[in-house]
Amino acid sequence: SYGLMIRDAVNNVVVPEILSIYGKLYKLAVEHKDLSMLARTHGQPATPTTFGKEVLVFVNRMKEELMQLGNIEILLKLNGATGGFNAHNFVFPEFDWINFSHQLINSFNAEITPLDNEYMHTKPLKVRFNPITAQIEPHDSYLRVFDGIKRINNILTDFAMDTWRYISDGWIKQRAVAGEIGSSAMPHKVNPIDFENAEGNFGMANAMFEFFVRKLCISRLQRDLTDSTVERNMGCAFAHSMIGYASLQKGLGKIEVNADKITEALETTPEVLAEAYQNLLRMSNVDKPYERLKEITRGKKVTIEDFHNLAKNLDVSDEVKARLLAATPLTYTGLSGKIVEQFDAKIN
């Protein structure tokens, strides 16, 4: 019964909520696929990207996990007190109990209706008969589900934390909600409480899922009862996950991307062109290009004019010089926009 409850909870409640977030993030990525943005690695300015491509990173991760979830079958038992069909075979020895159990459990898959979702049409979880068990089905298939949900929760935690930072930097604006208290002491504040609430609930859910994964695969000899009290709490982990999803959706409904602020941050960080310059100079056989760029940029506040002065004084072809002078932080985003355009959001 727990296996069927997990299947139905994931198929009918959890996955539709995850897909709702998936769709919102995908549309956000498409909408801002060409919005040039300063990347940060180790918290420091790095090669420019686009806002849409960075959101798509999370979308793609979610897609991969949802596809993995679709490969999981929850195993069920129907084979007697210690897994040998003892009583069944003793009373009706002529009956094919193994085949009967297989067919009966497989019939539960007929109950699964398609998902009404533009990205995913097939509900991910199905059930299958496990003919080789002790008194209990070993729960390993439950744990694969829990690990899958946990990874999705981690991905969404990562997104919530990044969004929190973008809000802090002013790159994302939050719409004030009438009647909502931002801070008990500072009336001006609009705090990112929905993203923080999502992060906290995903942490609670995953702490429980991690314990389930450690505990439920272990049972003394043919069975002990320690799994029983643990299984009664599986719903709590799903509940915290659902609160996290709802909080994240609420937060997404109150934000808008501040394109001007994102553009300003990138335009005032021209040092990110150092990568472009040093690679083109290397291709042009300029001596020690990395060191030359490091000398004018590392630990210094540079301007676009500093790069232009370097380019003008280089012994390179006019074509290379023109390419260097035309480069700007806003245009140095590689194929980021194209990556978003070519992404297939359908989950097979």
Residue ranges and their predicted role:
Residues S1-N348:
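Conserved, well-structured ligand/cofactor-binding cores
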